[in-house]
Amino acid sequence: MDSQRNLLVIALLFVSFMIWQAWEQDKNPQPQAQQTTQTTTTAAGSAADQGVPASGQGKLISVKTDVLDLTINTRGGDVEQALLPAYPKELNSTQPFQLLETSPQFIYQAQSGLTGRDGPDNPANGPRPLYNVEKDAYVLAEGQNELQVPMTYTDAAGNTFTKTFVLKRGDYAVNVNYNVQNAGEKPLEISSFGQLKQSITLPPHLDTGSSNFALHTFRGAAYSTPDEKYEKYKFDTIADNENLNISSKGGWVAMLQQYFATAWSPHNDGTNNFYTANLGNGIAAIGYKSQPVLVQPGQTGAMNSTLWVGPEIQDKMAAVAPHLDLTVDYGWLWFISQPLFKLLKWIHSFVGNWGFSIIIITFIVRGIMYPLTKAQYTSMAKMRMLQPKIQAMRERLGDDKQRISQEMMALYKAEKVNPLGGCFPLLIQMPIFLALYYMLMGSVELRQAPFALWIHDLSAQDPYYILPILMGVTMFFIQKMSPTTVTDPMQQKIMTFMPVIFTVFFLWFPSGLVLYYIVSNLVTIIQQQLIYRGLEKRGLHSREKKKS
């Protein structure tokens, strides 16, 4: 096997992976689009008592910090809209990215409240509480680091329930604190809950689609417990009424999409019930309900939780709840992508440009892999040196395949040649390549990150296809510089078109990934020359053998 055959192997592996990825994405039929409404929100089955009754009409209040622009409904105190001012909807757009939405076409809300036997959000106790607020708009002022939004409700028995949203400057974590004052003569049994609900089918204005060659990031629900650090839960599974229903101390529930997430993390010493529910009308939910607590007459009880609503910034999410940072979708190669991203982020702290950081990390990765690359080229050179002997053996033994195989293995052993020596380094490089892809597609830090000149977004494709063409040119030079023993006409034609095939593949790839591959190819050219010089001194390579 030689380096040109390696290109063919890479192509076959790559195409196979893309076919598998597409099959994974499409094997489950998507639910039919339905008109979403706000009237059916009671969870079915085992989660029935955790459902949230219809919100009805309340007043919408505005809550703004430097990084969050929330709309909260005083009926129940749900967050019905969340805008992220620091993240434009599109490149060069003045409109902020909208994470939570309540519209006739799409629903994505963060609900919370107090249920249980005496909770005001218990459907058996009537409509959801209509909270009183002091004003219609709350804004984090200059020089202010914390913003509190208190909402109060007093039931018919005189019990007072206070729900306070606490937001901090530069923070996407929102603390939701409950205060229950029992004015009656009997204990109040109260449970807190947090629920995320979302339309399963994306409307046209949100479903941007993707090219056939792009990897898809996960969109759906997820949860974490002390026993299961991170588990995804597909919307399709919820739509089929195969729902989650587990108890856990600690943990969180979340809904995920590319770059952004929402999550509820309860703060209590008791047990929480984690559940999913098909709410009907094409809406799925995931949530938690806490273990009931008793608030004695004349006493005050407190319960707390945290809502994350924003970008998937790993270090900040990890500070909110254990393992919440795992929601960044790096796919099945997360164990490679995560350390690569940490290294990339460390490099970026010095150079200040994600594109140059990718270039530097490419040199680092290829430098670490240089011994494997050298072993690969040495193994291929030895295989080329044995070709005359192997050809003579084939002519001597004719069609006796068994004897040919036996004598070839004996020859490899005598010459200390591993026939698979050229494949192993290739198998090591492929997961790293794919892990980099997952990292670029899943890291919000690279979303709309500029590089230089015409590359204004490293997570998007090159608008002028210059980088893919340059990548194809570097592949062409590598191919021309590499010795070959390929004699089959069909294989020769395939080898000739490999740079073109790869260029077409990479037209739709993120610019950051294409940049990595260009730099990696340039490093290959340099390393190739250094290795060939060493092989020439050992008599394992001759420039006359190169195919021009």
From Swiss-Prot:
Keywords: Cell inner membrane, Cell membrane, Chaperone, Membrane, Protein transport, Transmembrane, Transmembrane helix, Transport. GO terms for cellular component: plasma membrane. It is a multi-pass membrane protein. GO terms for molecular function: membrane insertase activity. Belongs to the OXA1/ALB3/YidC family. Type 1 subfamily. Interacts with the Sec translocase complex via SecD. Specifically interacts with transmembrane segments of nascent integral membrane proteins during membrane integration. This is Membrane protein insertase YidC. The gene is yidC.
